[in-house]
Structures are given as C-alpha cells and as structure tokens.
Regions:
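Acidic, surface-exposed loops and disordered segments
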Residues: 1-188
C-alpha cells in the first residue's frame, strides 16, 4: 500500500474518460468514502444522488455555462448535497465528503473531477442548483454543492511536483511574508 502523501501527490482532476463502466463494488467504495467523511457535530448533513444513466449524465452536463460538459463522458456522477436545516456548515460538510470520494477514486485507479454547482448558472442563466434540483427531484431543504464525475481515465496526468508547492502561502504563527529557503522550507 502506498502512503497517503503519495496518493495526494498523484491525484489530479480527470475530464476525459473511457467508455468502461465502473464496477459496482467500486461505486460502493466511492459512496462509502463519502459516508465516513467527518461532519460538524457529527450531524451527517450530506446526502448524495449517484447517477449512471447515460441520458441523465448528458442532462447533468448542461448544468453550467462552462465547466460541466465532461459529465456527459463519465461513468458515474455523484450529486453532493447538504441539508440546510440541519447545520449552517453544510457546504463544508459536503465539501469534505466530495474530497473523500475523489481521494478514494484515486486509490481505486479511477479519475474524478469536481463540477461546482452552488452559485453557478446554466447557459440560459437559471441557477445551476435549481436546474439540478428540478432534474433529480431534490427537495428544497437540500442545497446542491457540486457534482463529482468519475470514470476510468483516458490518460493519467503527471503527479504534483513537490518543488512547485506554494509554500509562500503558508504563514507560521501569524500572517506575514514568509521567506522560503532553498530547500523549500518556510523560514519564520
């Protein structure tokens, strides 16, 4: 088994997938990853709709002006939602669950890509959240955060380059301009 660090460095967004379906046990593993994600006060405010139907994937791909067309080519899309009546931090809860699924996908050798829905619009300027809600009969109390598309990658991207990490965005103790040593270490 590889380390978690290696998994994180290898995970990249994939927008092009092969036609191969995802095995049912892999779908279950992806959803299990979402269900074990931590939530504020253990509220489990998230809910998910898993979509494999090709026609529905095509319709979901039209949820945004730009940046959602890849959903038509994925084998599985998971709509990630949060119950706004359960907690005011449903966005954070749902985001963690989506990220867990993406890391699980990488561990399974699958590709994934996040499609933001909340605060986005369709080509005809409808709120993307309402478009998805209407399409999938999602009740009003569930906010639609994103759709994560999964599939077998058409190609594997290069891992993140550790030397290119933006350590200057890290501040120790308080916010200040940090100096980066030649070895990539942040100097206080």
């Amino acid at each position: 088994m590889e380390s978690f660090n290696e998994l994180m460095m290898r995970r990249r967004s994939s927008r092009k997938f092969t036609a191969e379906p995802i095995a049912p046990d892999q779908v279950q593993e992806l959803l299990k990853a979402a269900l074990v994600a931590p939530t504020s006060k253990n509220a489990h405010s998230w809910q998910f709709v898993a979509v494999e139907d090709r026609e529905m994937l095509e319709r979901l791909a039209a949820c945004r002006k730009m940046g959602s067309s890849f959903l038509s080519g994925c084998a599985l899309a998971v709509v990630v939602m949060g119950d706004v009546t359960v907690t005011d931090v449903w966005v954070e809860d749902a985001s963690i669950a989506a990220a867990y699924m993406q890391l699980q996908a990488e561990d399974l050798g699958l590709g994934s890509c996040w499609c933001q829905v909340r605060n986005r619009h369709t080509p005809d300027d409808t709120e993307a959240e309402q478009y998805v809600r209407d399409l999938l009969d999602i009740p009003y109390q569930l906010g639609v955060l994103c759709i994560v598309g999964f599939g077998h990658r058409e190609r594997v991207g290069r891992p993140h380059d550790e030397a290119a990490l933006l350590w200057e965005h890290v501040h120790i103790g308080c916010y200040r301009t940090a100096e980066i040593a030649g070895d990539g270490q942040v100097q206080a």
